[in-house]
Amino acid sequence: MFAEGRIPLWLVGLIAGIGAISVLGLFFYGAYAGIGSSM
């Protein structure tokens, strides 16, 4: 699937960045909604 045989570093960083932003967004949204404090 990958021509180089491995995942490009920029793609790993991009996915990691999106994942981190999503997790932080869900965490702050949960805390704002009042369900984050119960977890």
UniProtKB/Swiss-Prot annotation:
GO terms, biological process: photosynthesis
Database matches in Gene3D superfamilies: 6.10.250.2070
A GO cellular component annotation in the UniProt record: photosystem II reaction center
Membrane topology: Single-pass membrane protein
Intrachain disulfide bonds: none
Segments traversing the membrane: 7-27
InterPro entries in UniProt: PSII_PsbJ, PSII_PsbJ_sf
Chief localization: membrane
Domain of life: Bacteria
Location of this chain's protein in the cell: Cellular thylakoid membrane
Subunit structure: PSII is composed of 1 copy each of membrane proteins PsbA, PsbB, PsbC, PsbD, PsbE, PsbF, PsbH, PsbI, PsbJ, PsbK, PsbL, PsbM, PsbT, PsbX, PsbY, PsbZ, Psb30/Ycf12, peripheral proteins PsbO, CyanoQ (PsbQ), PsbU, PsbV and a large number of cofactors. It forms dimeric complexes.
Assigned protein family: Belongs to the PsbJ family.
Protein name, entry field: Photosystem II reaction center protein J
Annotated source species: Crocosphaera subtropica (strain ATCC 51142 / BH68) (Cyanothece sp. (strain ATCC 51142))
Gene name tied to this protein: psbJ
